[in-house]
Amino acid sequence: MKEKHEFRIVITPFCNYRCFFCHSEGVIEECTPLLLTPQDYGFIAKAGKKLWGWDTITITGGEPLVSPIYREACELIAKEGVRITTVTNASLVSSPKKIFAYNSQVNIFLHTMDPVIYEKITGSSYPLDRVIDTVIAIRSYFPNMILHLNYTVIRGMNDDPLEMEKVIRFASRVDGEAKFIDLASTNKKIVVPYEEIEKNLLLLGFEKTKSDNWQSFFSRADEKAIITRCGFSEQNSNRGYRNLFLNPDGMISNGSGSDLRTNLLLEIHERNIEGFAKKIEWYFPPAKRI
């Protein structure tokens, strides 16, 4: 399977949850200045598609829906013919029809179907049943939306196959897919290896249908599940390039805390597409002109 690459736009460093394992996409700090506009994101989408054929963008954070420019940025990105995935905890979705009008895919964090465990993981008192209601509402408004329920597997909290099964079944009911993610943590006691997550799915009767360097895909009758490797985890650090994080100050990163970074703010603000391209192609070798 040919690897695909994209920009992962960290639109805001802020989040209303406090998940204890959060790696902050792009290794971004809450003090990071918000220097990019919706128009800037439209330029980035256009450049990525024109130069390298990157026709998808993932918007993440922080919690992307905290950002006041989220919807306008989505509109301008979509106008460039680029498909949008939003990664969200779904607690701020007041109107799914308006918020996700420009999305092709929504990935919702749902690490458990147990409200007590959910509160422990997220550090939030936001009710789990409201998140579940939001997932159902998204599906009702967008019957063709790709819907992933992201489940970070944590030892001693939600690594039991029966707990995984509950999210798999709910995902199936809303015509979505459960996506299990290995934990990025220096505390090895709570890390469940990718191979163990795969073993759990096989025990639940799934069969592996395909895989690449970062993901494996499984099926069981009409149900589907995915395991994806977290690019921030030490055990996956030698797997090469995947995606390019763009922080709201114009800094790009491949996500590693020790990663050399470079800033594209000037090139973005000046709409200098050639300068933009040269910096990215130097920094991110998989970026090949089409």
Where are these regions (language model features)?
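Canonical Radical SAM [4Fe-4S] cluster-binding loop centered on the CxxxCxxC motif
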Residues: M1-Q39, W52
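Hydrophobic faces of well-ordered beta-strands that scaffold small-molecule active sites
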Residues: H5-I9, I57-I59, I84-T86, V106-I108, ...
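Disulfide-bonded cysteines in secreted/extracellular proteins and peptides
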Residues: C15, C19-C22, C230, N238, ...
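Short loop/turn motifs at secondary-structure junctions
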Residues: R18, G53, E80, Y102, ...
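Short Fe-S-cluster ligation motifs
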Residues: F43-G61
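Radical SAM enzyme [4Fe-4S]-AdoMet core and its adjacent flexible, acidic
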Residues: V116, K120-I121, Y126-I132, I136, ...
